[in-house]
Amino acid sequence: KTFSFPLGYAEPFNIQHYKPGEGFFSWHCERGMHQTHQRALVFMTYLNDVTDGGETQWLYQGKEMKPKKGLTVLWPTDFTHTHKGVVSPTQSKTIATGWYNYLDVRAIAG
């Protein structure tokens, strides 16, 4: 089943490419600063397979997801879903990340 959000409730997505040994490996959440307080959900799509590290870990859930090309993960942006990426020492990792908001971001931007 598919779903859609009205135009404006989704921010443009970002593509991040991490070389071996790189990554966003600090615990963080996707909401909290003034610029991000309207975020409700984050999605992340893995754009390649990573077999040596590269997992996404969620602190309070005690869960992790192995990168598999085409897999999309969706979770709340709040501190309840604090997460981090595990660095792969030997492989690159490419992801697309985006956010769905409580408010129409076009109205916020003015």
Please provide the spans of the model-predicted regions.
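Fe(II)/2-oxoglutarate oxygenase catalytic core
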Residues: K1-T72, T80-G110
